[in-house]
Amino acid sequence: MASSCPCGANRTYQQCCEIAHNNHADVKTPEQLMRSRYSAHVLGLVDYVVKTYHPSCNAEEQREGIAQSIDSDWCKLEVVKAEAGSHENEGFVEFNAYFNEDGQRYCLSERSRFVKENGLWYYIDGTFPEEESEQDPRLNQSISSLKVGRNDPCICGSGKKFKKCCG
């Protein structure tokens, strides 16, 4: 029985990402490349991930780090949006990739940029949503139960003491 593709595209692996894994030239869109790279992470295909980086990224020099990221327990991919770039040889894919580590589930959110060169799509770089600073658990309480000491950091996030800021 054929297994479903790790990229979540509702096709079998053989009908989906295996085609790209066997021949990079068969990748027709940035989204297809992004999905095949995610599947390569799930399946441990370090060589595929390295060769689908744009040559300017010198991915071979970062092979060890790439192999470590592939070694994560990847569990789900959500494509948020795929869009064209400023020209036909550029595209963007925004996605969330979920993985488990030390009994916790994490999400990698990225807007990846892909470029097409000599007929091949490559991953070149990505941007990440601004990392939210870890919120103080007291901020999840209702206002009536929030107790802030005068010498505690201000809840507005200014970095000042509460008594010198909002207190």
UniProtKB/Swiss-Prot annotation:
Protein name (database record): UPF0225 protein VP1145
A matching Pfam family: YchJ_M-like
Transmembrane spans: none
Family: Belongs to the UPF0225 family.
InterPro entries: NTF2-like_dom_sf (IPR032710), SEC_C_motif (IPR004027), UPF0225 (IPR023006), YchJ-like_M (IPR048469)
Lineage: Bacteria, Pseudomonadati, Pseudomonadota, Gammaproteobacteria, Vibrionales
NCBIfam families registered for this protein in UniProt: PRK01617.1 (NF002449), PRK02250.1 (NF002592)
